[in-house]
Regions:
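Extended, charge-rich alpha-helical interface modules
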Residues: 12, 16-152
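Secretory-pathway ectodomains
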Residues: 1-7, 12-14
Length: 152
């Protein structure tokens, strides 16, 4: 099944292949599979939410680069696709929560709603870390993200 991001990806690869130059030295660093898929999911959300043409071009450029890395390095399976959908859903929730927190900030409303939203950030980040860890475990990532916070 082809989704809108696969089609957009294929169309944009051709557009940006000739435009992708790096005026500064490229920084290449190993990252975990979970981190890569997390970043790609965030870029897909940005492509959907951010409408500025200039911003879209920058997001598309990064998206294409990271999708190429995914295509070259990650063997997809139904489980990985499911985990990608889950991490994207968590990141969409975080996007909405962060926007609502900013609205509270704008109104200087730091009451019950602000506290609930603030707590939702770390609950969602904990889910996100768990999904990334599962992706890393399944794919045998060399690098694994370690998180340790006080229990709640």
């Amino acid at each position: 099944m082809i989704n809108i991001f696969d089609i957009r990806y294929l169309n944009l690869v051709n557009q940006f292949n000739t435009q992708m130059t790096n005026k500064s030295k490229k920084i290449l660093s190993e990252i975990s599979a979970g981190e890569l898929l997390d970043k790609i999911s965030i870029l897909e959300i940005k492509l959907d939410k951010i409408k500025s043409k200039d911003s879209q071009e920058e997001i598309n450029k990064e998206y294409i680069i990271l999708k190429k890395a995914q295509d070259l390095n990650i063997k997809s399976s139904e489980k990985i696709k499911q985990l990608f959908r889950e991490i994207k859903e968590v990141n969409q929730n975080l996007w909405e929560v962060e926007n609502r927190i900013r609205m509270c900030e704008k109104k200087k409303d730091f009451g019950k709603k602000f506290i609930e939203l603030s707590r939702a950030v770390y609950f969602n980040n904990d889910k996100r870390a768990k999904i990334k860890s599962e992706i890393n475990e399944i794919l045998g990532s060399n690098i694994k993200e370690i998180k340790q916070y006080a229990d709640y």
